[in-house]
Regions:
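Alpha-helical transmembrane segments and their immediate juxtamembrane cytosolic regions
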Residues: 1-317
């Protein structure tokens, strides 16, 4: 099944917008899971030493959002990157990405870095644009020069198998293994950069995998129809709800913050496995459910989609 030249993927638009806006919810309790930020408010009597422990219900919501939000964002970014390249060609794609990602990163990350009174090249919450810029460059190189590589043909074979529901099993195995490897590269869990020179290889590799999975999804668009079948949604949703409590029990902070330095190898491995499984299941469930039920445009949907990106950029974590 070839992608349509004119079809609009409203469900994916809504999912991407939701992922952006949920970032505001995720960042709301940021002083709890990155308590060192609280030290910037010592004049107000707030510091990491005075921060109480995060309540369970807040932790559950934050971990649930954290488990799938950014992987889904990079997945959809890969999908729409492949779509724009397919419909408009390489020159348009490069210009579009330079404006949407490159200029946005330079302007807004620099502005926030300057406004805090200590400009040191900090990325703050714009780290995802920095990684997206790097990954997009890798994507262009792969499309231009990598089509004859063994990795490319292996990925095509994996995607071909996913045109059946049973094909989700090898896909899950690859994504879970990728997460475990990337976690250990970054010292136990994937991390994010704080400055332009602070690239975390595991995190970059992990989000690259999700981006290329999204690009592959566009190439094998029939997979979307499998994901939104009722039987598939029930299977993914049930498994996702079953696995999440284990993920929450083994979760050890956020992006490495609050991580217990004495955690053992076994607990690290189990935590990585459950994190990977939770991410995979919730991401595909969200993809399938939105594609199934959001099938047409609406003024509210358009407003939500157009508003989500600038709101996320301008909010202060």
């Amino acid at each position: 099944m070839q992608p349509s030249e004119t079809i609009r993927y409203h469900g994916l638009d809504v999912l991407r917008a939701s992922a952006m806006l949920l970032g505001l919810v995720f960042h709301a309790p940021i002083l709890y899971y990155i308590p060192e930020i609280a030290d910037g408010f010592k004049d107000l009597g707030i510091s990491k030493d005075t921060m109480p422990e995060m309540e369970l219900w807040v932790s559950v919501i934050a971990q649930w959002i954290h488990s799938w939000r950014m992987p889904v964002f990079f997945l959809i970014s890969g999908f729409f990157s492949a779509l724009v390249l397919h419909r408009n060609g390489l020159v348009y794609f490069l210009k579009d990405r330079f404006v949407r990602i490159g200029l946005t990163l330079i302007i807004f990350a620099s502005l926030m870095d300057i406004l805090d009174g200590n400009p040191t090249g900090k990325l703050n919450h714009f780290w995802f644009l920095y990684y997206l810029l790097i990954i997009t460059a890798l994507f262009v190189l792969t499309v231009s020069f990598g089509r004859n590589s063994a990795a490319y043909h292996l990925a095509q074979g994996l995607l071909a198998s996913m045109q059946r529901r049973s094909g989700l099993i090898p896909f899950a195995a690859v994504m879970i293994l990728a997460r475990i490897i990337c976690d250990f590269i970054d010292g136990g869990t994937v991390k994010i950069p704080t400055t332009y020179f602070d690239i975390k290889l595991g995190g970059l590799m992990y989000y690259t995998v999700w981006f290329f999975a999204g690009a592959g999804l566009f190439a094998r668009i029939a997979i979307l129809e499998i994901l939104c079948q009722p039987r598939t949604l029930i299977m993914l949703g049930t498994a996702a709800m079953f696995v999440f409590p284990f993920h929450h029990a083994y979760a050890d902070g956020f992006f490495g913050h609050l991580r217990d330095p004495d955690i053992g190898f076994g607990d690290t491995l189990m935590g990585s496995f459950f994190a990977a499984a939770t991410t995979f299941l919730w991401s595909l469930f969200a993809l399938g459910i939105t594609h199934k039920f959001v099938t047409r445009g609406h003024a509210i949907i358009t407003w939500l989609v157009e508003l989500s990106y600038p709101v996320y950029l301008f909010h202060l974590p």
